[in-house]
């Protein structure tokens, strides 16, 4: 009897800055529908989701709450998992970026890329958006504010490690051009090519010293690994990747991922940063990254700051009561 074909599907890991709203829940439910369909078609499906638990925003939220960052993320991650379970989603793995095995591999990955010459130490000076955890140049701002979320930005200057993005840019462009299915829908591919890749990539900041809640850089512990090199690698650490060459049978079976299902607001990180990290690690790229649209409420994106948020668990309870 022939072995079932594998299908590895992931969602973006949810950021633990607060309770997820129904727009966040949309993604896990959509991924669950795909996973269930693939199982019905005879695939051996592995469905991974989880929580992204480091960063300055969480450090500040924990301070406001009067608890440690770990206590804060334990509470929020537990709430996210509770809601995902309430939605009866059939995930196989719920990874947390505070998991010991994930943190261990992130340290190894950072060191491997540093030893290879892809990461170097420098200084960052520019504008920083704390909610988005992103750096921007003055020219990238829109009306002096964050181009992604529209919130105010603050000047930032600090020592940091950087990843040489431009080293792999041509190779990524070639991959995108020869694999039309890689970025979907096509409008997202055009956006990435025209707005980021073709104009040229700047080197990427991959460490911070202005806050402490993160994975320390082993050989320079005043630095913590910056969000994307930590968060994105969950897709490989969660299935047993080892940067020293001792990856598990599960990793060798499942990677590359068949589908990364993500929101359109983080398509750049998954179709530029992530594949370049994988190239540097000599790993194959995911087969497809799909950037789904937002779930809108009223005249725009659902947002806690706009006060237009609906919560999946509350709506679910209303439906049960109304039966």
PLM features: what roles do these ranges have?
Residues 61-74:
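A charged helix-plus-loop insertion that forms the helical arch/lid used to bind
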